[in-house]
């Protein structure tokens, strides 16, 4: 029942995203003629040095087990390197990094998983490049794909260093604002992690305390990198 409600919410929110883009502007001819380098320049200009927050919907598919999970919440990003993911559905969970340390807190279990942020957010995992967009050019081979949806530039990112957990990342970038509204990550097993963003707010004031975490008394603490 929860999955059905989450899936319904995802459909409604995706519809709102598309309607908002249709209403903004139809003058995409010039934008569609941009080169890959020009698109990357504009994306970097849009994100570099800026804080932002947005809502997200996540769909994770484990191919071998035929499992599809849905989740939603809010993301907060402070440049450079700081992120906070607040999952609200199907259950509350917080993922926080200050660029150095990582905390994952599950209130229902009173459990905290902690470790080194670079070990878990390297090479684009967890959409980490959103906190420092210039990492895209440094870490990936990038190509411009044909878009099935006329509102977006579709970018294909392949890690320069081969790895099993991330072999391919697809970015959907709006043609009018150069905002990343969809990230799809694939691994070598054919699993897919799709994140869609909406209601972006840029240049917001995000206190540094949002990106640190104080472990609650009595919490079960698990070291991820041991």
What does each of the following model-derived ranges do?
Residues 32-40, 44-62, 66-68, 96, ...:
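Flexible, processing/modification-adjacent segments and terminal tails
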Residues 60, 77-79, 161, 175:
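Beta-strand elements of well-folded, non-transmembrane domains
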């Amino acid at each position: 029942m929860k999955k059905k409600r989450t899936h319904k919410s995802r459909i409604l929110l995706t519809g709102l995203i598309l309607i908002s883009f249709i209403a903004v502007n139809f003058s995409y001819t010039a934008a569609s003629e941009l080169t890959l380098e020009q698109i990357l320049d504009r994306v970097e200009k849009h994100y570099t040095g800026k804080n932002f927050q947005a809502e997200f919907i996540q769909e994770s598919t484990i191919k071998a087990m035929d499992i599809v999970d849905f989740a939603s919440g809010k993301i907060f990003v402070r440049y450079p390197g700081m992120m906070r993911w607040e999952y609200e559905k199907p259950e509350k969970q917080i993922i926080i990094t200050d660029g150095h340390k990582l905390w994952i807190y599950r209130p229902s279990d009173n459990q905290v998983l902690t470790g080194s942020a670079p070990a878990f957010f390297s090479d684009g995992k967890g959409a980490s490049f959103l906190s420092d967009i210039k990492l895209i050019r440094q870490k990936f081979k990038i190509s411009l794909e044909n878009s099935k949806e006329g509102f977006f530039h579709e970018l294909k990112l392949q890690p320069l260093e081969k790895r099993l957990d991330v072999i391919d990342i697809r970015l959907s970038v709006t043609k009018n604002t150069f905002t990343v509204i969809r990230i799809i990550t694939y691994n070598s097993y054919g699993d897919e992690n799709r994140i869609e963003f909406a209601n972006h707010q840029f240049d917001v004031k995000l206190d540094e305390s949002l990106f640190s975490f104080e472990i609650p008394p009595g919490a079960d603490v698990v070291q991820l990198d041991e």
